Curated annotation (Swiss-Prot):
This is Protein phosphatase 1 regulatory subunit 21. The gene is Ppp1r21. The keyword Phosphoprotein applies. It is found in: Early endosome. The lineage of its organism: Eukaryota, Metazoa, Chordata, Craniata, Vertebrata. Signal peptide: none annotated. GO terms for molecular function: RNA binding. Residues 1-209, 556-605, 694-742 form a coiled coil. The modification Phosphothreonine is found at T652. It comes from Mus musculus. One of its GO terms (cellular component) is early endosome. It holds the Pfam family PPP1R21_C.
Length: 780
């Protein structure tokens, strides 16, 4: 895998290198083209300069010509000024000469005028040529500057690409060396993998044999134990009992319960809407208590009076449908027989709406023809008539689709199963349309009611009736919106659970087969129930519940424990208050006891010694009298308790007036001591809170600084790791280059050693030859 990754990286780098080479060639070509275009522009600039010089020369010649013409004009004007007085003197004598002078003057004037026009034209041409030259020169200079900058940029890009190419080449060479090393290791791994594949093939063969045996066994079990599956007559397959899906049944019952609740909200709103509409007809535009209403409105009121017989069955039909969906049944379109009843009730209500629609439209037209109807009210009535038509059409559409939904439970061949997706989608669209039209009715009726309230003859009864109709319309709007959103949220679930038959089938199962299937399901459930034997209880239910509670209490969360601590603190504070109360009561009771003992002692001292015979009787009656007095005093002095945040206080009636001062002093001292104690505790708590707040602020600052330092350290660590990896790569490349250089140097040294040894041998041979020659010469 590592070699494959490196090979892929190498191929990517080679592709990038080829792309960069192609880009480099394109950039070089662009630079050459730009240089050629800049040279052409320079040539054009030279040509423009030459044309400018020519134009300047022409301008100079024209200015010179203009000066000559101006001088000539001055001379002609002077001659004309001299000729005018002469003409006056010789006016009588020389009429012929004056005519000649006039002709010459006219000729001169025409010549002068032509010269002036020519001069003006030349000035204009010169100015236009000068402006055009300046404009062209500026454009060429700007284009030259842009081309120079682009050429510099292209050159910089080329330099950068060449540097990048060199770096890429070096990196590719190093990667190639790594890949060669890894390829050798991968070859070894490939050999090991071949051995492993041979072992795996043997294991696969054994597993295949084992699984084929298991498959044959499973197929035999399926053929014996699977429900009846007739491939020739599919009608028999409808008698198979499907798997019981309790979750599906519970969800269907929940959905039916929600639908029942929505219908129960809609039915009273519809009843109120029709009833208050009937009441309004009796009031406006003609009050039936004062005058007779029109026959049309009488008939309309009679029909509206029957609305309950059409509206209430809708709720009853939905209730029967809800009761038919239980946990033991299979709820699909073939088994929901009660949906047909709801569809019939909805059809009767739609007929009722069709019956009252013409009367409602005519009643609104009659209101428009009334003298009390203003143009604004007439416009609102027209909008309401259109809304009523739309509402009836929406209910007709909804009734059509609900009837189609009830078909599978009565006529399964009426419509294919694939078409019911669009049927359910259209039901949702019809419900949304009902919501929209009810919003329009509420809006338009609100505007109509506000206009009618401004009529001077509007009675309080009319205002109240309009408010009731408007509130019922708003209720209908809210209910329709809830039903539309509810159906839109569950339409996918309805589509997924249309039938209990095979999913590949195109039609529905007949209602008779569905009924038989439900009977078989009940029989199968009864049979399974008879087979089930009750299990012996391992742990009593009460003990299991107690253990579960203990387990849950032992695994409470932090919030639960905090709540328990808070409750414990509250209990402790209440107990402290009760403790203070009873301490105060004990002190008061002690004072009462001392007073009572003193009173009894005073009474005993008042007895005289002359009453000795009745002493025993008196001693016997004193405790009884004292006990009676105490009981009476206790009854008369029934304490009244009052509680507060500090403690509880017991108040007694004014019969103990002598003890009030001492009691008040005692209570005052007690509360002063308590207030001083609470004040000291409050000050201590405030100082602790200030200290804790300062510590928290310091800790938060330290935390922020620590987070910042952590971020900086992580960034530094990342940079350091990058530097380390870069330095390691550089070290590897330099090491490899040094090793290559050393190998080259060692080869070079070997070759040099060989050449040196050869040269030494040649030198030795030459020395030997020279020695032999010298000996020969000496011998000679």
């Amino acid at each position: 895998m590592a070699s494959a990754e490196l090979q892929g990286k190498y191929q990517k780098l080679a592709q990038e290198y080829s792309k960069l080479r192609a880009q480099n060639q394109v950039l070089k070509k662009g630079v050459v083209d730009e240089q050629a275009s800049s040279a052409a522009l320079k040539e054009q600039l030279k040509m423009k300069d030459q044309s400018l010089r020519k134009l300047q020369q022409e301008m100079d010649s024209l200015t010179f010509r203009n000066l000559q013409l101006a001088k000539r004009v001055e001379l002609l004007q002077d001659e004309l000024a001299l000729s005018e007085p002469r003409g006056k003197k010789n006016k009588k004598s020389g009429e012929s000469s004056s005519q000649l002078s006039q002709e010459q003057k006219s000729v001169f004037d025409e010549d002068l005028q032509k010269k002036i026009e020519e001069n003006e034209r030349l000035h204009i041409q010169f100015f236009e040529a000068d402006e055009h030259h300046r404009h062209v020169e500026a454009e060429l200079r700007s284009r030259l500057a842009t081309l120079e900058t682009e050429a510099a940029q292209h050159q910089a890009v080329i330099d950068g690409l060449t540097r990048k190419y060199m770096e890429t080449i070096e990196k590719l060479q190093s990667d190639k060396a790594k890949l060669e090393v890894k390829s050798q290791t991968l070859e070894k791994e490939a050999k090991e993998c071949r051995l492993r594949t041979e072992e795996c093939q043997l294991q696969l063969k054994n597993l295949h044999e084992d699984l084929s045996g298991r498959l044959e066994e499973s197929l035999s079990i399926i053929n014996e134990k699977v429900p009846f599956n007739d491939t020739k007559c599919h009608l028999y397959n409808a008698l198979n009992v499907p798997l019981h899906n309790r979750r599906h049944q519970l969800k269907m019952r929940d959905i039916a319960g929600q639908a029942l609740a929505f219908v129960q909200d809609l039915v009273p709103a519809l009843l109120n809407f029709h009833t208050y509409t009937e009441q309004r007809i009796q009031i406006f535009p003609v009050d039936s208590a004062i005058d007779t209403i029109s026959p049309l409105n009488q008939k309309f009121s009679q029909y509206l009076h029957e609305n309950a017989s059409y509206v209430r069955p809708l709720e009853e039909g939905m209730l029967h449908l809800f009761e038919s969906i239980t946990e033991d049944t299979v709820t699909v379109l073939e088994t929901t027989v009660k949906l047909k009843m709801f569809s019939d009730h909805l059809t009767s209500y739609v007929r009722f709406l069709r019956k009252i629609l013409p009367y409602q439209l005519k009643s609104l037209e009659e209101e428009c023809e009334s003298s009390l109807c203003t143009p604004a009210l007439r416009a609102r009535n027209l909008e309401l008539s259109q809304d009523m038509k739309t509402m009836t059409a929406v209910f007709e559409k909804l009734q059509t689709y609900v009837t189609l939904l009830a078909l599978p439970s009565t006529e399964p061949d009426g419509l294919l199963r694939t078409n019911y997706t669009s049927v359910l989608t259209n039901v949702g669209a019809a419900l949304h349309g009902f919501h929209d039209v009810m919003k329009d009715i509420s809006k338009h009726y609100s505007q109509k009611a506000s206009i009618e309230h401004e009529i001077p003859t509007a009675t309080q009864k009319l205002v109240t009736t309009n408010d009731c109709i408007l509130s019922s319309a708003v209720t209908l709007t809210n209910g329709a919106g809830k039903i539309a959103s509810f159906f839109g949220n569950n339409v996918d679930y309805f589509i997924a659970s249309l039938s209990y038959g095979p999913k590949t089938a195109s039609g529905f199962i007949s209602p008779l087969s569905a009924e038989c299937m439900l009977q078989y399901k009940k029989k199968a459930a009864a049979y399974m129930k008879s087979l089930r034997t009750p299990l012996a209880e391992s742990v009593p239910y009460g003990e299991a519940v107690a253990n579960r509670r203990v387990l849950l209490s032992s695994t409470e969360s932090r919030e639960g424990l905090a709540q328990q601590v808070q409750q414990s603190l509250e209990k402790i504070s209440k107990l402290e208050q009760e403790k203070e109360h009873w301490m105060l009561e004990a002190q008061l009771a002690k004072i009462k006891l001392e007073k009572e003992n003193q009173r009894i002692a005073d009474r005993l001292r008042g007895t005289t010694s002359a009453q000795l015979p009745g002493l025993a009787q008196e001693n016997a009656t004193v405790p009884i009298a004292s006990s009676q007095e105490e009981a009476a005093a206790k009854v008369l002095t029934e304490p009244v308790q009052s509680t507060s945040l500090v403690g509880m206080l017991t108040r007694t009636p004014d019969s103990e007036a002598p003890d009030v001062e001492s009691r008040e002093d005692l209570i005052k001292s007690h509360y002063m001591a308590r207030i001083a104690e609470l004040t000291s505790q409050l000050q201590l708590a405030d100082s602790k809170s200030v200290h804790f707040y300062a510590e928290c602020r310091a800790l938060s600052k330290r935390l922020a600084l620590a987070e910042k330092s952590k971020e900086t350290l992580t960034e530094e660590m990342r940079l350091a790791s990058q530097n380390i990896s870069r330095l390691q790569d550089e070290l590897m490349t330099t090491k490899r280059s040094y090793e290559d250089q050393l190998s080259m140097m060692s080869d070079h040294l070997c070759s040099m050693n060989e050449t040196l040894s050869k040269q030494r041998e040649e030198i030795d041979t030459l020395k030997m030859a020279s020695k032999g020659n010298s000996k020969k010469t000496r011998n000679r």
